[in-house]
Amino acid sequence: MAATAKPQAPLFTKRALFTLIWPLLLEQTLSVTMGMADTLMVSGVGEAAVSSVSLVDSLNILIIQILSALATGGAVIASQYLGRKDEENASHSAAQLYSVLGISTITVGVVCMLLSRPILRGVFGSIDDDVMRFAQQYFLISAVSYPFIGLYNSGAALFRAQGNSRISMLASLVMNIINIAGNAILIYGFRMGVIGAALATLIGRVFAAVFILWQNQNMHNPLRVQHFADLRPRREPIMKVLSIGIPSGLENGMFQIGKLCVSSLTSTLGTSAIAANAVANSVSTLANIPGATMSLAMIPVIGQCLGAGEKKQAQRYTMTLMGVAITGLALANLALFILMPEVVTWFSLSTEASTMCTHVVHWFNLFSVFFWATSFTLPNALRAGGD
């Protein structure tokens, strides 16, 4: 009688999944609520200030999302190597990721600093003089922070790739506490307005990058950079990272370009419309937290399963994480839909802007329930498989 193959033990128990997911959930919640607090504090300076920050952030998000896609590529490669128990190549791929993102973010940051005004004019056209003045100040300082957020995203992605989401959560906590404290001190204490908000963000990102690089060099971390020579760019591992990072960056970039076009169109409708769109973008991210959390969890879970050759387990975990994402999105969007008329009163908006903001978020809630998870969570399962 032929022997039957022994079923492979689950790579991720329920406890292991919970241990991975809850720090990611807390990290996303921190990021979103601190982002809302940022908008809330800037709104106290005036609609021109919050409008300028919103316009620049739409451009910042486009740039950071495209560059951060490289971090996703590196995390996928590292998680697959870890699934195969090949720690040497996993470590080399991590070092190459730091090199690629370091060079890319420094280059982009310098270009944005040198050409800040032409870029803003080219993207947003003619906007109020006050909005343009604030926007240029905010964009210039934001560009300085690109290398630091790039290093943070690289380190966070690599820690998640090995199933350790606690470190990225702590780094996010440090960054957001510094950001919110810096906002309070610089915006309200020193009356620095938009410049204060930008400096608080920069300082938070510097601390987060330093913290996560320090944690990366822990002797027990299989993805630590063991030698400075490992950081020297090497064609083969870089091409593996880029083979996933570039398509992912183009996908993220196309979506963000669409949002940027909306922001550009909104900028022609006046300061109230820009402010309403800014607050709507900030508040709507609350409803995305469950989906965004599962998106981050997809990379290490599916990547390690496929790296170990466990396709059936990869399929099962994909369905599980998608189910959690869809359920969480439905509940979060329902809650925000009901509470939005109250939430909008937290911000210093005119009556006209408050009404527009509420309408925008309500429409977002209706579509998010049905399309967010399949648009943003599911693709990370494909990326984890190298697609």
Model-predicted regions and their roles:
Residues 8-40, 44-45, 61-73, 77, ...:
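N-terminal transmembrane alpha-helices
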Residues 19-38, 141, 175, 204-208, ...:
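Transmembrane helical elements of multi-pass membrane transporters/channels
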Residues 22, 38, 74-75, 115-116, ...:
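Hydrophobic/aromatic residues in alpha-helical transmembrane segments
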Residues 29, 33-51, 120-129, 185-192, ...:
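Helix-terminus/linker motif at the lipid-water interface of multi-pass membrane proteins
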Residues 36-40, 110, 154-158, 177-188, ...:
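Alpha-helical transmembrane segments of multipass membrane proteins
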